Amino acid sequence: MDPFDAGAGGLLKQPKSVWATAGASVVAFMGIGLVDPILPSIAQGLNATASQVSLLFTSYFLITAVAMLVTGFVSSRIGGKKTLLLGLAFVVVFAGLAGTSGSVGELVGFRAGWGLGNALFVSTALAVIVGAAAGGSAAAILLYESALGLGMACGPLLGALLGNASWRYPFFGTAFLMAVGFLCITVFLKEQPKPARKTSLLDPLKALGHGGLASVAVSAFFYNYTFFTVLAFTPFVLNMTPYKSGAVFFAWGVLLAVFSVIVAPRLQKRFGSLKVLGGSLVLLAADVLVLGYGSHTTAVVCTILSGAFIGVNNTVYTELALGVSDAPRPVASAGYNFVRWFAAAAAPFFAPKIEEWTDIHIPFVVAAVTAVAGAAVVVVRRKALTHEAEELEPKHATEDGVTVFAN
């Protein structure tokens, strides 16, 4: 079934619980790109260097990566709804505290707590949407990717609008919006059935013993380094006002959303997932290389254009991670995310450090190399990825229900 079908199983005809979860997911993803337009302002306001301020991303995603081992353990014991609410509560508290920070150290610490909340919420939200959405897992994944794209687009916009007055306001704004999400989840989402089997802390690591899933995770690790070099380091290179930087990353996020939800499925249908992923990674590598060596205008254009390739990659990686192994989807997703988020933590730290050690161009050269490395993994492991995913598709089709709530 086409997930965009206007029938009963169409993408837009969903229960209130799905819309409440998706809406809160938008705000959760806004928190990732929220700080982009205000990174220079934070550096100026707290007398910090670019590498110090970039730790806002590093602490956030380092905790998110480790928390992936915990999310399934928690949600399989207390249920999906309570896990979502726990995650939202963490975000509300730590986002609010981030706005009160008096030093970079405090802000980095509060962002780490924020990352824990976001991990609990975002990973569980995908499972909840898959289990409750009309139209099956294809529609659910597209709905989730829509929330991701919209959040990535609106996060920088909110950061720019509120951050132009003070870098503190975007954090308070996020806390308020997540509090609204907390109320919506409380009212509209019914308590979800717990899975028949409780997830252990080691299950995601054991799942990575599967060659196909490990290959997807390693490829995504390299890709995420490129992704977050663009997201976390480019604002310092562009060196624009919050409004202008917000506009650039809003356009970037719009392309990300459009290519995630509309373009990627059509490309996959025509060319196949692995060819699309490999080609998109190579194009992303070329894009960031031009970004690093081009003029300021060229850098702006390439930053926006990268959203298209990132959108395609996100959709294909998500589908591969959920379908390539014989592990339950939630466990496979947790193992996959555990690996790839470490790159999201590494890139914001190393990119400005590499600039300090060399020059402003080399971080983008490294990012281009990692994108190509991700494509190389896909090419080398293409047979295992293709055959195993096709063989396991019927098995995973039976898992779309209460068993996914361990994620």
Describe each model-derived feature in a short phrase.
Residues 68-79, 259-272, 355:
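Helix-to-loop junctions at the C-terminal end of transmembrane segments
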Residues 110-150:
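Cytoplasmic helix-loop-helix junction between adjacent transmembrane helices
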Residues 324-360:
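A late C-terminal transmembrane helix in Major Facilitator Superfamily
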Residues 175-194, 377-382:
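C-terminal membrane-cytosol helix-exit motif in multi-pass small-molecule transporters
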Residues 2-12, 190-216, 401:
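Juxtamembrane intracellular "pre-TM" segments in multi-pass secondary transporters
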Residues 135, 142-186:
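Helix-loop-helix hairpin linking two adjacent transmembrane segments in secondary transporters
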Residues 65-102:
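Conserved MFS/SLC helix-loop-helix module at the cytosolic interface between two early adjacent transmembrane helices
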Residues 274-317:
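C-terminal transmembrane helical hairpin of 12-TM major facilitator-type secondary transporters
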